[in-house]
Amino acid sequence: MLSAATNRLTLVEPRPVDPNASTMFEHLEYLKYRHPRTFALLDKSVISAIDAITERANRLKEIRGHGDFDEDERGAAYRGRQLAVPRAREYGDLRIFTELAKRLGGFSFKQVGLDIIGGNGTTARNASNLLPLESAPYIIAGDPCLDMVDDALARHLPAVWQCAQETLFADESLDFVVGSRGFHHVSAGARPAVFTEAWRILKRRGVVLVVDFEEGSPTANWYSEGLDRYTNAGHRFPHFQRAEFLNFLTAAGFKDIDVFELYDPFRFWADTAEGARNSLLEHLVGMFGLVKLQRESGETERDYWGRIDRIFTPWCTFAADEVAFDPEALRRLSVFQEADQRWRAEFPRVALCAIGIK
């Protein structure tokens, strides 16, 4: 994928010999050739110097906490499921865009945003699916997992190999920064630096929005208990308290700060109640790589999905006061028939949304 760009473009001479730096060098050359709008926003003092490229690339390779998205872990399954069922988290996606647009005074195709835990371009795809073409902003994915970045680039989406706490973007180059759902993968010690970095790269009146899950909540426990127990890679990452988000935003210099709950369910539709529920459960098992939840010998399909339903129940069951903030929020995994006679299965989740303005 990178060979064409490498043959045509030169950033620095001589080319780096460090293997990590060489990978970064080829990545940057590819961006310059195939994604010039993204490349133009990068910090030229970094990307034009071999020493700087080498230092950044080596620090990036040392980052831990994102390896479970590599090709040989659950990365391929995660990407595949997201692409196959783009509407599964549509309700939460729309809420995120609504809150962001409210602070920006609306969206424009001239705006440029960065998803700092962007994976393979999920936020950019969601924007193209959910926002009007004439106003959808240009959204770049940044991620420390090179497999994720390469997958985004292969799908013609702008993506940069970098970490959230040390991006490659120039000062005051972006209109908004988003950290959507995967922020807990950033190590606890690096989290304050992410907000400081967001402040640096945002334009005046730019907006930062981070979505993750409150420590101890059923949704956070889905990751720290469910994924940790039933995936090969485990999932031991601390989530957040409301006060932490407030402190991070305040210390970085943001104003008009708000931290609030956001309903972020998985939803699936089918022609039958059983089909909707089973499709939802199958999606969750596959997307999150729950390979230790296999169907047992002699277990019928009905019994298998019933067992999975019971295992998942603690991680999608809420008290009434925990979901009172949204009239559409459900308290437990539910299946019901809608007006068009189709059945909808819903796996409730509650996230924390933290927003600040520069």
Give names to the regions the model predicted.
Residues 237-253:
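Short alpha-helix
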Residues 7-109, 122-126, 148, 209-233:
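Conserved class I S-adenosyl-L-methionine
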Residues 192-204:
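A short glycine-rich, Lys/Arg-flanked "PGG" loop and its adjoining helix->strand segment in the class I
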Residues 181-182:
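Short catalytic micro-motifs in class I SAM-dependent methyltransferases
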Residues 16, 34-39, 258-357:
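Conserved Class I S-adenosyl-L-methionine
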Residues 178:
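A conserved beta-strand element that flanks and buttresses the S-adenosyl-L-methionine
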Residues 114-166:
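Class I SAM-dependent methyltransferase SAM/SAH-binding core
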